[in-house]
Amino acid sequence: MKELVEIIAKSLVDKPEDVHVNEVLGEESIILELKVSPEDMGKVIGKQGRIAKAIRTVVKAAAIKENKKVVVEII
């Protein structure tokens, strides 16, 4: 899951070297914290959050396949 978010985010931004994904294991879910450079934040979020929603949808679909609950937070 972590690698999936990283690949998607790196393909969207101008500075792929500044993309970092931190995985936090919770009791019932996995939290993926996506960090990008401030200049690329708009590209990852998109207009009205459409790209962020699309990233979350793709990750959620992959998580369901593995019977897990994953939350993507953009920091």
Curated annotation (Swiss-Prot):
CDD domains: KH-II_YlqC-like (cd22533). It comes from the Bacteria. It is found in: Cytoplasm. Keywords: Cell shape, Cell wall biogenesis/degradation, Chaperone, Cytoplasm, RNA-binding. Its main location: cytoplasm. GO terms for cellular component: cytoplasm. PROSITE patterns: KH_TYPE_1 (PS50084). InterPro entries: KH_dom-like_a/b, KH_sf_prok-type, KhpA. Residues 29-75 form the KH domain. Gene3D superfamilies: 3.30.300.20. GO terms for molecular function: RNA binding. One of its GO terms (biological process) is regulation of cell shape. Forms a complex with KhpB. A probable RNA chaperone. Forms a complex with KhpB which binds to cellular RNA and controls its expression. Plays a role in peptidoglycan (PG) homeostasis and cell length regulation. Belongs to the KhpA RNA-binding protein family. This is RNA-binding protein KhpA. It comes from Clostridium perfringens (strain 13 / Type A). The lineage of its organism: Bacteria, Bacillati, Bacillota, Clostridia, Eubacteriales. The gene is khpA.
